[in-house]
Amino acid sequence: MIKNGFKFSETKTVSMHFWKGRANYSPNVYLGRTRVNDVTETRFLGLIFDRRLTFKSHIEDLRTRCLKTLNVLRVVSHTDWGADSKVLLRLYQALVRSKLDYGSIVYGSACKSNLKKLDTVHNSGLRIALGAFRTSPIPSLHTEAGETSLELRRLKLTLNYVLKLKSDPTNPAYDSVFNPKCVDYFNLPTTKATPPLSIRVLPHLEAAKLAMERIELSERPVTSPWLLDTPEVLLNLTHHKIIMTSRGCIQRNSALPHQ
């Protein structure tokens, strides 16, 4: 990595030991001669990871950020000069639902009690966009807005990811999903550990009757895009005014260099 110009920052690098047990064992990790700080949770690519992979801190942070964004919808949905429901739903999808979707494949392994905290954000956003009362039934909100519950949406995004991953065996995550390890351990009735994505998604694939072996592999181009010849663009007609140039002249001049 040093040859490629990449260097780890000693002050920004942290270590975290993922462990489900009660004992808190943290190995000493050194970067050169500097000991890396050991933390209980850290943010990586917008997701907050904790030692036990409960994603409780991430869900709390995500809920707080989404509730602040809902204030924008409340302002825009003014009864006198506010936007209509169609525009408000688009704003909700762009500002709030996009945040809920990001990383849902990862934090979807959290327990249901933590994930339900996000359902209130989703339902509140739909109520604001539709102008519905607080007593409106949740299934009616989903039907009127054309939205599904967050649980079904997370499942949809997960299945889309798995199907796309199946078409690319060169992906680094391919073996982890389709060649899982310790399957028998997670299938034990006494196991309390959360199964990985590869095991959680199997019942849904079987219920949907998706034939994974029939998914075609994605074809990669033989030549890299940056190695292709740059196409020649003819801009001769830009020197003539449209008013002074007839349609027939334009057609003849544009086809002449290609004959």
Please place each PLM-identified region on the residue numbering.
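Basic, alpha-helical interaction scaffolds
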Residues: 33-105
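Short, conserved micro-motifs composed of acidic
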Residues: 3-40
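RNase H-like, metal-dependent ribonuclease domains
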Residues: 20-33, 53, 78, 85-87, ...
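Surface-exposed helix-capping loop/turn segments at secondary-structure junctions
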Residues: 2-9, 76-83, 105-108, 133-134
